[in-house]
Amino acid sequence: MSDVEKVDGECSASGKRERLTLKLGDKLKVPPSLARGTSTGKSFTTVEVRSKKRRPGEYISHDDKRRSGLNKAVSGLTAQEQLFRINAINMADSISAKEKELAAARKAKEEEELAAAAAVVEEAVEEVSVEGDVPPVEAVEAAVPDVEEVVAPVATPSHSNKSGHDDRGGKKYAHGATGRHKEKEGVSIKKVASSRGASKHIKLDIENALSGLEDKRVTRFSSSTHKRRSSNVKSGRRISREVVISDKMTVRDLALAMAEKAQDVLRMLSHVGVEARMDTGLDSEVACEIAVEFGHRPRVVSIVKMEQELSDVCGDDFVSEPRPPVVTVMGHVDHGKTSLLDVLRKSNVAEKEFRGITQHIGAYQIDVDGKKITFLDTPGHEAFADMRARGANVTDIVVLVVAADDGIMPQTVESINHVKAAGVAMVVAVNKIDKSDADVGRITNELLQYGVIAEELGGDVMIVPVSAKTGENIDKLQSAILLLAEMLELSAPRECRAQGVVIEAKIDRGCGVVATVIVQKGTLKKGDIIVAGDSSYGKVRSMFDDADRVVTSALPAMPVRVLGLNAIPKAGDTLIVMPSEKQARDLLWHRSEINSAREENRAVPSFSGAIMASMDSKVEEINLILKADVAGSMEAVSCAVEQLVHEEVKFNVLHKEMGDVTKSDVLLAEVSSAVILAFNVRVDAKARDLLRLKKVDVRHYQVIYDLVDDVRNMVSGKLKPIVQEMQVGLLTVRQMFSSGKSGTVLGCYVTEGAVTRGATVCVCRGETVIGEGTVKALRRFKEDVKEVNRGLECGLLVDGVKGVLAGDVIKVLEIVERMRGVE
């Protein structure tokens, strides 16, 4: 039987691997094909590993001549060691082949880079020769004095250099041809062998040459694109540009405006005698001087003027087109404003409001006979005065709703004043004419004293009697609005950048910041960069109309809900579309500078005056945290709190924000002993779990009336009560008795009320007060009693009063504390 037994048979043509089993023997005999590493389709398994020490000096050679004598060389090794040797030989062969491939690839890449670099240098040489300042050879040598390169024209073909060798760690590596000649129009570059062994760094040398040429400002090249870039920058010259200098400009801002390094600007400032840092504000004169030193043309523009230039969305080049009217419905609370609007837009918003009272400003657009009308519904409570004023300022026509049964009310008068201040047209809708006590004539006469004269009385105000309940005369009201809008000839440009007014703003859980906007000019599109107010900007991610339909653009007078702002704007802020995000940030920066300048101009009380005021005043403080659903509601809540401030009670609003009550709100309220006023918002899950452990007062409201009453009660609870002395009894002294050590007992008759033991009494003789004291003992006959009523006689022992005579009058007093109210 042979030493090697086939187990799995012959290797198939498909390339299946044969398995060889090596049997026991004195020495392991390996087939020559396997020993030479040529058998790649076979695998073998050792049956037994025989341990035997290796003879000294035995090794496996890498040479093919020694590989044939493998059995003799490894006869002293174990079977496992011999297999390791064989595998190492095979792996070494594969690694050697891979190294050769990589070396060839590297060599080809180096040749390509060398050729490209040589081409760039040739272009540099040509450029220098064109300039005529320095000959080509001298220019390159002057740029790179330390590199041994020779640039010379040759007439013969280039020859490759001999290979160089370097011995590292006993191994030899072939460098190959490191220096080569590139022919182009009779010019070649030859690398001369360096004494420092830098023959393989020709690429670095060429890059240094290019850098030196760039320092001489001859031309600019790009080695990455292998193309020459022409430049206007020459030695000693800078690009001059117009630099806009504002009133307040920091060193960093000036450097950015000039496109210069901030360190260079600081160095120039130190040369002119100004010590500054990056955030130091510069005077406009100093900034202009620095700009001139850098060779620029300064132009001084005030911050206010710059803000106006940035916020100007359209000029005279845009043609105005007709637009729908914006109509605001105003009036006293519960006079039927929302119900009337529901009839106009054929909806039922009033029933969705809590108790039927509007708490937010709403924007809707309806279609009447093919013509659109935009309506704004405002709350009627006095706390929403700013909201109504805002509605009057953005509107074209005001529909003043007056209940026919109630007549003119305080918020009706306030709405009339807003209309007059805004200078807009007005239509009076006398609502609830379906009631039995309705009197339209009385309403017309009452309006006269406020300067509202009806058309039938010779004025210019249309008065339309309507009924939101039955729908009577609703068509006449619509016709009156359209007629007035036609007379006003309303128009606005559509092609310019959009501008609008923020009506409401809030934070939505799924959408982020949502702002309700009325577009006034231009067309607001999805993707526009917008700025709202002094701190909000962003990109319009999406828009929705009043019916929650997605829209991609909004024309003038169209109300939309805009998503994409980074912060909540204030209700009433102007929304502007900017050409770029950079200009949007610049506009916000200018507005912040204007606001900071206004803050600096305000009078600041002195430190000593503040200390004296705090020492003299003993004011009770109430810490509050305000939470509301929208910006308009937050404004109303803040207004209500400010109006209820008393001279003895002060509200400290620690934090106010739109959105639900959060965990941070609860923690802040705990450490500051604050009360959380939550208007139309809830408490989120994490804050709800925390409230079970913390003693924090969270008060929820859905109607502004309830919030105002509760805040008023909070103020009353902090005020010191009014102390009053009330007379509850009257006695007449008839006789005095001496009781020895106890004192004088007064025999009295109760003429009014009653007297009790321990009561406070005042002894009077005519109009003169003899003294005041306390009833120490009270007896009827010889029995101690607690109280003696009217018409009975009793004996009193009064502590603290002496010299009482018969006929004196004793008044029984009671100290009463009464809570103080807030108007």
UniProtKB/Swiss-Prot annotation:
Q: Does the keyword GTP-binding apply?
A: yes
Stretches for region G1: 331-338
Compositionally skewed regions (Polar residues) per UniProt: 36-48
Keyword 4Fe-4S among record annotations: no
Q: Which superkingdom is the protein from?
A: Bacteria
Region (G3) location: 377-380
According to the UniProt entry, its GO molecular function terms are: GTP binding; GTPase activity; translation initiation factor activity
Q: Which Pfam families match?
A: EF-G_D2, GTP_EFTU, IF-2, IF2_N
Similarity comment: family membership? Belongs to the TRAFAC class translation factor GTPase superfamily. Classic translation factor GTPase family. IF-2 subfamily.
Q: Which HAMAP family match?
A: IF_2_B (MF_00100_B)
- NCBIfam families given in the database record: IF-2, small_GTP
What this protein is called in its record is Translation initiation factor IF-2
Q: Which organism is it from?
A: Anaplasma phagocytophilum (strain HZ)
The UniProt gene name for this protein comes to infB
